[in-house]
Amino acid sequence: MTDTGWIDLALVSARPQAMGALLRYFRNLDLAEEAFQEACIRALKNWPRTGPPRDPAAWLIFVGRNSGIDKVRRQSRETALPPEELLSDLDDRESELADRLDGAHYRDDILRLLFVCSNPALPATQQIALALRIVSGLSVRQIARAFLVSEAAMEQRITRAKARVAAAGIPFETPDAVDRAERLAAVATMIYLVFNEGYSAMNGPEGVSADLCDEAIRLSRLLLRLFPAEPEMMGLTALLLLQHSRARARFDANGAVVLLEDQDRRLWSRPMITEALAMIDKAMRHRRPGPYQIQAAIAALHARAERPEQTDWEEIDLLYQALERLQPSPVVTLNRAVAVSKREGPEAALAMVEPLGERLSGYFYYHGLRGGLLKQLGRACEARTAFDRAIALATNASEAAYIRMQLDHLAAEPATVAEEEKR
């Protein structure tokens, strides 16, 4: 066979389960990863000749397990492997192993991997890097490029994360039912952080960091397959799809951010939106609202509006109020202020924004929104000061370009009498 694209797809699809099973066996991230890589090398060599195995994941686990055992035995006779009785499901021939990889094992092995990578003992940046490397299989070069750091720096970050996993004694077991809900929330947060890292790294049409967004959506779908009746997993996946559906419309030709209300909605991905809307409608029928469902419902209202003026700002305001009650945060209040500005005007919104200044003093979007509201109220000098602060806090060129455009508009507008008197 000359076309080996199917092999890459099979390896990517099988990776989470195979890595999870190998981690359960070896209790060591490095060894599990090396064993999986060796299995992949053998797959690339053998599968073009023999064709796909009945169960690629079982094949990779079987070959990886044997490769890892050989490596341990070669390196040191003192290295102890886990007791055989704990791992009877991995001690069969490949054909028998495939029969044993039922739904329960599939879920537990993948959850094990996700729980290790999203453990709260790891800083958020290490959680993201470890998940992208271990679960998604992105190369260190790909991850470093997405984070805008050197390969050496990213290699160190991943190494530190693995060392912290070992030092903290992070368990390689799947948690019991009592702990599972809390751990699932941590996994969802990690996936959302992966998406946000890609979303915020987008820097104009040619610099869109879509890899991280795509990986986050893939991980979210994976989690949803494990828990298909969990409404918050539906909400998370729907939210990511709705946000990513607008990727092509987020920047103008000069690379500046285009606000949601100014975006060309013809560029939005209708297939993503259609899938997400069906998903959030299904989630809401469970009547167990959570933060991701509410955020997805807000994004859905924007997606359903064919034109900006059709946006249901009253409903968006109510949803943000619900989110404030469920998950109080100055950022949630800041976002709600946008809805209030559309309903009641900039003065009412500014009254909500001003008290947030101390807690959000280092937040780009706080100063950007405040500057915009002051600009609408004709308070140009104050708006200029807010915009200057926003530029200083911009995390990428597209954010800075948008604020500079606002400053240019201010410079072109005639000053009010009150502003002239201040000069």
Swiss-Prot record:
NCBIfam families: sigma70-ECF. This is Uncharacterized protein R00370. GO terms for biological process: DNA-templated transcription initiation. It comes from Rhizobium meliloti (strain 1021) (Ensifer meliloti). SUPFAM superfamilies: Sigma2 domain of RNA polymerase sigma factors, Sigma3 and sigma4 domains of RNA polymerase sigma factors, TPR-like. It holds the Pfam family DUF6596. It comes from the Bacteria. GO terms for molecular function: DNA binding; sigma factor activity.
